[in-house]
């Protein structure tokens, strides 16, 4: 009985440790920090402010058509799980 319980515990630990290396979700500050760590050559991006972008005015729906279909790092790694290899592809 003790041996089988030991085997079950070891198998659970192995499964948990291998799951930690798989895909996971990166959102918000964790996503930004992870990308900064993985991609040190990337420049720091300034936070967008409303005043900075207000001068561009209203855009017609035709000019924004392609934007909806694009997938970005947030779509890939926050809304869904991703691996470090996927994150590295954004460097």
Swiss-Prot record:
Signal sequence segment: 1-19
Record-linked SMART domains: IlGF (SM00078)
Keywords (A to Z) from UniProt: Cleavage on pair of basic residues, Disulfide bond, Hormone, Secreted, Signal
ATP-binding in keyword set: no
An example Gene Ontology molecular-function term: growth factor activity
GO cellular component, one term: extracellular space
Residue spans crossing the bilayer: none
Domain of life, per lineage: Eukaryota
Pfam families: Insulin
Propeptide: 49-69
Cell compartment(s), UniProt: Secreted
Cystines in this chain: 27-78, 39-91, 77-82
Family annotation (PROSITE patterns): INSULIN
SUPFAM superfamilies, alphabetized: Insulin-like
InterPro entries named in the record: Bombyxin, Bombyxin_B, Insulin-like, Insulin-like_sf, Insulin_CS, Insulin_family
Family in the record: Belongs to the insulin family.
Subunit structure: Heterodimer of a B chain and an A chain linked by two disulfide bonds.
Functional summary from the UniProt entry: Brain peptide responsible for activation of prothoracic glands to produce ecdysone in insects.
Record's protein name: Bombyxin B-1 homolog
Gene this protein is translated from: SBXB1
